[in-house]
Amino acid sequence: MKLLLHICCAPCANRPLADLKAQGHDVTGFWYNPNIHPFTEYRARRNTVRDYLQEIGVPLIEQNDYGLRPFVRAVAEDIPGRCVKCYEMRLFRAAEVAKAQGFDGFTSSLFISPYQKHDLMKEVAEKAAETFGVEFFYQDFRPLFRAGQDFAREHGFYKIGRAHV
């Protein structure tokens, strides 16, 4: 399957990428994260993703409009509902790009995190898939979380909150 993998950061993406490729999928990374701030954090994560995907030969589609203002507008009116807004912005864009660029489906590295609202993300991704007429490829990557963090540490990946200025 030709899959678009939305990527939040390299530490979360490395094991899903390896696993999806091992399953025989043709994977392309997708960077769109208007929720990340400050800009130094955004840049550090994006650059680590770029470098890693280039190193392993995986194509990357980047949407580099630093969308903090639209993100803040989207969540400011509904602070308790900010998670769903954040998931919607990223997963709906991933579905839209997947459909527009001829991918069979999409998924996200967010599904590796034990800290995210997994069921809510899945629900949002399914709505995005239905909206754009593209398959949401669901896989619970959480069992790979520790291995991904270990891999990131061993390879010196930038980790959240330690921006390189």
Question: Model-found features: residue ranges?
Answer:
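Conserved small/polar residues in nucleotide/adenosyl-binding loops
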Residues: 163-165
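Short, surface-exposed amphipathic charged segments that create phosphate/polyanion-binding patches used
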Residues: 74-81, 148-158
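ATP-dependent adenylation/nucleotidyltransferase module used to activate substrates
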Residues: 1-144
